[in-house]
Regions:
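Two-component/phosphorelay signaling modules centered on CheY-like receiver
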Residues: 2, 6, 13-32, 44
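Receiver (REC) domain active-site loop signature in two-component systems and cognate sites
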Residues: 58-61
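His-Asp phosphorelay/catalytic-motif detector in bacterial-type signaling
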Residues: 4, 47-50, 74-80
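C-terminal output helix
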Residues: 91, 109-118, 122
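Acidic, metal-coordinating helix/loop segments flanking the phosphotransfer/catalytic sites
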Residues: 32-51
Length: 132
């Protein structure tokens, strides 16, 4: 083990996945999923995922359906999710929070916001785990 926290980036756009990895830098280990089905497969295979960056609109299974699977298996109790979308629709934002996301990130990405949101969510979940 390299000691780096593992982040699953689930987005059907290879460019968006690469951009997020470039913004976040070498301090993390990354897993990539191009659709929701692959995201669920990776969640089953890797029990040490620290964070999921999850796009809403993906083929085969969208981000909302991934969240439903995560709730079904109680993975949301252990793994925080930051939902990603270009949509400004508040209904999607509310639905994401209702399904259990820790935070919501809009595209286009702002470098400082991406870094801070990821750091804050990881820090808060680490503190929560220490308290339980």
């Amino acid at each position: 083990m390299n000691g780096k926290q593992k982040i699953l980036i689930a987005d059907d756009s290879e460019i968006n996945r690469a951009l997020l990895m470039e913004i976040l830098g070498d301090g993390y280990e990354y897993l990539e999923a191009e659709n929701g089905v692959r995201a669920v497969e990776l969640l089953r295979e890797h029990t040490d995922i620290a964070l999921v960056l999850l796009d809403i609109m993906m083929p085969q299974m969208d981000g909302f359906d991934v969240l439903k699977v995560m709730r079904c298996y109680s993975w949301l109790d252990e793994i925080p999710v930051i939902m990603i979308s270009a949509a400004k629709d508040t209904a999607n934002i509310e639905r994401a929070y209702d399904l259990g996301v820790a935070d919501y990130m809009r595209r286009p990405f702002e470098r400082v916001m991406v870094l801070r949101q990821v750091q804050n969510v990881l820090m808060l979940y680490a503190k929560q785990k220490r308290l339980t």
